[in-house]
């Protein structure tokens, strides 16, 4: 890591932002924060309503940067600092009040300009901000004052701030009644109603009528005008600039009623947009409430309720039947069934006993458990999932990058078109100034990019949140999009298509001079001393069948590399190994017929081992890695989804590989591969198919996972490695979640494309009404508002995609 990168990482602070009304506002906020003195960089996460600030900035500075929409900024809640690393100056804050991504961007920009802030990064999806450097909550809230953002500390690394905040719990978010939250909108709407009543009774030109409409415009549009005028002064054009100019123009030509309608409908549109984004974020907030905040802990012989922040590694937690588990740990006493649906998406409770791992947020259904704590609260699996999902929501997907770039040029172009519509017909074609200025104002309103800007953030946040609740951790919008474009999927065999746990499938005694139990006892005594992976299957079989082997004395035990093992028992040397070993021993009864029987077992995907002496064959035992019950159905569903190329990669021999591959139904089989061979094959597949996914355990096939377009790891709930290294993790070690993830990804892509097409299409239709002069401010604002509402509702459908 170079020095500049290290500095940014050290000074990152995260803030929550309240008040974003749209994605465009988040972007504007980010831009403002970046311009703050002392801020090196900032990144807004619109989906999470957060901003990461790299550098020094106060909450006041951040709220000032967000003043255009009265954003409220709050540092994220402080978390336990175990070992200060290069990220020790990164401060995380939750931000309440983000109304749009543009506002989040503006807030990020404002935070970056704060003195003492080296960089900042807003996570709009998680409503958080990372601030790198020193900044107080007041400074951050000042940077977000344009949208009255509230900033709440979540993770503060700066020692001076830490000392003050260490014992401070994150404040509870206040539930503001609807009528209070939207009091100005309701009052302005009431004034419009009275205005139209006066218009009906007293006429359009009556002073009372005009004053009622003017009052409605001023009250309902105060926050709009505050931002709009600031933008005009700075030549910063966004949707609020368009609306401000349109309302001013309508007022100038005397269209008070329509100007007030534009203000009110725009405010309603923003409120609905904010509501939609909050609904999308709720999927992650619900994860935060899964784990209890307190746990019953035994200390010094006493059982006491302790807040999870104060529980240490090594503490003993008592979990009663029907209670949720508060912390990750290992069971030291008790047996129960635990519902892990919150973490893994599994609907069926899992049997748990001593030495089994349990996770925070899961439900203990039956027995009393004593659990030894293995992780601090911020390091639990559910905490990591929440953190990674919030980070994922903050990553800009390719579709979002396109929309952001498009919107940057779109708004100024709309203003130019509106000006041309207002000026050209009267100047060159003898048109009426009043008529065409009115048409130009309508073009400004219809050109508002609300629907375009909001579609991708809501879609990505909804999809990632839904996936997380069903046990699929997707670590970014980019991976969500790429998964939908996958043309081929490579499967590592062991632990993915198979269970990864070998079992004894066949055992046949071929000599009448020895009993079955006696022979298996000899096999077990020899395999007990072996380091071969398949030995565990034999030991497990012996335990299940109550076969004792401790009284069998083995002498001169030797491992025969690549062939098997040997040992002397009561003066006789026994051998266990491959057919090749017994061929080399020239055992007399190793016939062609016997060899064919062994090949039959091998062709069934089993590893056959022979037991005997140098004189005779006593028996044959076969061990196999059991195929998952779901593997065949998963491959079938993937083929039905249009993914024709499903390839199994394995280091097994060709016979075993072909047997398993044929059983599960993959389209291609690659056997006898080393890890490097798997990597090379993935590169070859990418060259041939373009987008390729690789699914494995995330450990021994890490190079191949990294080389694939999308790396998918199994068993994320039990292994930190899988969560941290893969692009997507199947938390419940459940392969059946893969088709769901592909379907969700494709549906997300389709909805984003449909939304963008619809939003642009509705605007083109409305703009065409300019030609005959039919476009009114009513039609303009209703088309924009309607498009925004329909786009938001369509995106929220992703929260309801089921895991079939």
Swiss-Prot record:
UniProt entry tagged with the keyword RNA-binding: no
UniProt-listed Pfam families: E1-E2_ATPase, HMA, Hydrolase
GO BP annotations listed: response to cadmium ion
One annotated GO molecular function: ATP hydrolysis activity
The keyword Transport is assigned to this record: yes
InterPro entries: ATPase_P-typ_cyto_dom_N (IPR023299), ATPase_P-typ_P_site (IPR018303), ATPase_P-typ_TM_dom_sf (IPR023298), ATPase_P-typ_transduc_dom_A_sf (IPR008250), Cation_Transport_ATPase_IB (IPR051014), HAD-like_sf (IPR036412), HAD_sf (IPR023214), Heavy-metal-associated_CS (IPR017969)
HMA domain mapped to chain residues: 11-74, 89-152
Cell compartments where the protein resides: Cell membrane
Catalytic residue positions: 492 (4-aspartylphosphate intermediate)
Keywords tagged on the record: ATP-binding, Cadmium, Cadmium resistance, Cell membrane, Ion transport, Magnesium, Membrane, Metal-binding, Nucleotide-binding, Phosphoprotein, Repeat, Translocase, Transmembrane, Transmembrane helix, Transport, Transposable element
Topological relation to the membrane, as annotated: Multi-pass membrane protein
Binding site for Cd(2+) 2: 100, 103
Reactions that this protein is recorded to catalyse: Cd(2+)(in) + ATP + H2O = Cd(2+)(out) + ADP + phosphate + H(+)
GO CC annotations, alphabetized: plasma membrane
Top EC category: translocase
Function comment: Couples the hydrolysis of ATP with the export of cadmium. Involved in cadmium resistance.
Annotated family: Belongs to the cation transport ATPase (P-type) (TC 3.A.3) family. Type IB subfamily.
Protein's recorded name: Probable cadmium-transporting ATPase
Organism: Staphylococcus aureus
Top-level taxonomy: Bacteria, Bacillati, Bacillota, Bacilli, Bacillales
Gene: cadA
């Amino acid at each position: 890591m170079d020095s500049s990168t290290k500095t940014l990482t050290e000074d990152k602070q995260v803030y929550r932002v309240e008040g974003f009304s749209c994605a465009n506002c988040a972007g504007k906020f980010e831009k403002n924060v970046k311009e703050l003195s002392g801020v090196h960089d900032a990144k807004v996460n619109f989906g999470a309503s957060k901003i990461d600030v790299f550098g020094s900035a106060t909450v006041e500075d951040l709220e000032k940067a967000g003043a255009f929409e009265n954003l409220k900024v709050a540092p994220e809640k402080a978390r336990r600092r175990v070992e200060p690393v290069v990220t020790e100056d990164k401060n995380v804050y939750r931000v309440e009040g983000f109304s749009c991504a543009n506002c989040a961007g503006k807030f990020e920009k404002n935070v970056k300009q704060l003195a003492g802030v080296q960089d900042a990064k807003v996570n709009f999806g998680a409503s958080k901000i990372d601030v790198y450097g020193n900044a107080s909550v007041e400074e951050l809230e000042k940077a977000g004052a344009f949208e009255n953002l509230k900033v709440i500390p979540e993770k503060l690394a700066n020692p001076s701030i830490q000392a003050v905040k260490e014992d401070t719990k994150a404040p509870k978010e206040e539930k503001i009644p609807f009528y209070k939250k939207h009091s100005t909108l309701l009052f302005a709407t009431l004034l419009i109603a009275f205005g139209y009543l006066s218009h009906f009774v007293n006429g359009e030109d009556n002073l009372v009528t005009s004053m009622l409409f003017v009052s409605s415009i001023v009250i309902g549009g105060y926050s709009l005008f505050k931002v709009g005028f600031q933008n005009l002064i700075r030549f910063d054009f966004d949707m609020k600039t368009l609306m401000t100019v349109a309302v001013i123009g309508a007022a100038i030509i005397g269209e008070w009623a329509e100007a007030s309608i534009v203000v009110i409908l725009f405010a309603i549109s923003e409120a609905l947009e904010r509501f939609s984004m909050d609904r999308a974020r709720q999927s992650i907030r619900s994860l935060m409430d899964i784990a209890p905040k307190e746990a019953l802990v035994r200390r010094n012989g006493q059982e006491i309720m302790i807040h999870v922040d104060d529980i240490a590694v090594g503490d003993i937690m008592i979990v009663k039947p029907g209670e949720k588990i508060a912390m990750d740990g290992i069971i030291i006493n008790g047996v129960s069934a635990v519902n892990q649906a919150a973490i893994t998406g599994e609907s069926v409770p899992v049997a748990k006993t001593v030495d089994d791992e349990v996770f925070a947020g899961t439900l203990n259904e039956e027995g009393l458990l004593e659990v030894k704590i293995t992780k601090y609260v911020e390091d639990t699996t559910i905490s990591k999932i929440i953190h990674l999902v919030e980070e994922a929501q903050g990553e800009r997907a390719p579709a979002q990058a396109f929309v952001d770039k498009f919107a940057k040029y779109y708004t100024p172009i709309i203003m130019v078109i509106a000006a041309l519509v207002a000026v050209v017909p009267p100047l060159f074609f003898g048109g009426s100034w009043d008529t065409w200025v009115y048409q130009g104002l309508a073009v400004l309103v219809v050109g508002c990019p609300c629907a375009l800007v909001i579609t991708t953030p809501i879609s990505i946040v909804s999809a990632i949140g839904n996936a997380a609740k069903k046990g699929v951790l997707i670590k970014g919008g980019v991976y969500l999009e790429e998964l939908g474009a996958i043309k081929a999927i490579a499967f590592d065999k062991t632990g993915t298509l198979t269970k990864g746990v070998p079992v004894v499938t066949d055992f046949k005694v071929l000599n009448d001079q020895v009993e079955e139990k006696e022979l298996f006892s000899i096999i077990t005594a020899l395999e007990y001393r072996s380091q071969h992976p398949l030995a565990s299957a034999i030991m497990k079989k012996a335990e299940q069948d109550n076969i004792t082997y401790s009284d069998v004395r083995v002498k001169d035990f030797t491992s025969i590399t690549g062939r098997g093992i040997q040992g002397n028992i009561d003066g006789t040397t026994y051998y266990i190994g491959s057919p090749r070993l017994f061929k080399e021993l020239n055992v007399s009864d190793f016939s062609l017929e016997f060899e064919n029987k062994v090949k039959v077992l091998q062709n069934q995907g089993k590893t056959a081992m022979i037991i005997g002496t140098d004189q005779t064959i006593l028996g044959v035992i076969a061990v196999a890695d059991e195929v998952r019950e779901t593997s065949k159905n998963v491959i079938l569903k993937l083929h039905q989804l249009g993914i024709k190329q499903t390839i199994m990669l394995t280091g097994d021999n060709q016979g075993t590989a072909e047997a398993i591959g044929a059983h599960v139904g993959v389209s291609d089989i690659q056997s006898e591969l080393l890890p490097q061979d798997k990597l090379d094959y993935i590169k070859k597949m990418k060259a041939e198919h373009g987008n390729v996914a690789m699914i494995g355990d995330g450990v021994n096939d890490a190079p191949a996972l990294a080389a694939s377009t999308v790396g998918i790891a199994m068993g994320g709930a039990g292994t930190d490695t899988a969560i941290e290294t893969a692009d997507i993790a199947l938390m419940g070690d459940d392969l059946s979640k893969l088709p769901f993830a592909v379907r969700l990804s494709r549906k997300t892509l389709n909805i984003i494309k449909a939304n963008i097409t619809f939003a642009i299409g509705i605007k083109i239709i409305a703009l065409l009404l300019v030609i005959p002069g039919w476009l009114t401010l009513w039609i303009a604002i209703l088309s924009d508002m309607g498009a925004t509402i329909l786009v938001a509702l369509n995106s929220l459908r992703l929260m309801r995609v089921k895991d079939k």
